[in-house]
Design a protein with these regions (language model features):
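Glycine/tyrosine- and acidic-biased, solvent-exposed loop/turn segments at the edges of beta-strands
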Residues: 6-178
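Sec-dependent signal peptide recognition
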Residues: 1-3
């Protein structure tokens, strides 16, 4: 079990598991800190020498707080990128998967499903797939279906001006207005 406490913006981790002892690759059912020569730092729970359970991972301005399974982000978690973008939601084997919210540093936001199970970075967000809502920083909003990161299927685009485009979308273009 993991208990997390945020004090002055810093995450403090506490676990009911005992402190890890001995060689790293033997750590199991324990809580510890692992730092690499490349600057990676993980504070959390371990099983068979792997990140497993609740943990906090940091590296070069990036931070993940959440669940791990067999050394991969898996379950609920929050990943903050060094550019200020943030993903909050479900993970499966190190990838966005299931329900989640991606908040861009410019204020844009996508809330919805992530299905394709590919690794994502702020430059490669092709995973919006299924039903979702994308709110632009200027107030425009699209609510509808997505495929491979593009508006695709039934959807409504509402502009801040009040103009509405509704109908069937294909590859980000309205093809059958309602």
């Amino acid at each position: 079990m993991f208990l997390g406490l945020f004090v002055c913006g810093l995450a403090q981790a506490e676990s009911s598991l005992p402190k890890c002892k001995g060689k790293f690759n033997k750590w199991t059912n324990c809580h510890g800190t692992k730092e690499s020569k490349k600057g990676h730092k993980y504070v959390g729970e371990f099983l068979n020498g792997k990140f497993h359970g609740q943990g906090i991972f940091t590296h070069k301005g990036r931070k993940y707080v959440g669940q791990y399974k067999n050394h991969k982000r898996h379950g609920q978690g929050t990943y903050t990128y060094s550019n200020g973008d943030k993903y909050v939601g479900e993970w499966k084997e190190h990838k966005y998967y299931g329900e989640g919210t991606y908040i861009y540093s410019n204020g844009d936001q996508y809330v919805g499903e992530w299905k394709k199970n590919k690794y994502n970075t702020p430059d490669n967000l092709s995973e919006r797939d299924g039903q979702g809502t994308y709110t632009y920083a200027n107030g425009d909003k699209y609510v509808g279906e997505w495929k491979k990161g593009k508006k695709h299927g039934q959807g409504i685009f509402t502009y801040i001006s009040g103009k509405i485009e509704e109908g069937v979308w294909k590859k980000d273009k309205l093809v059958t207005p309602k």
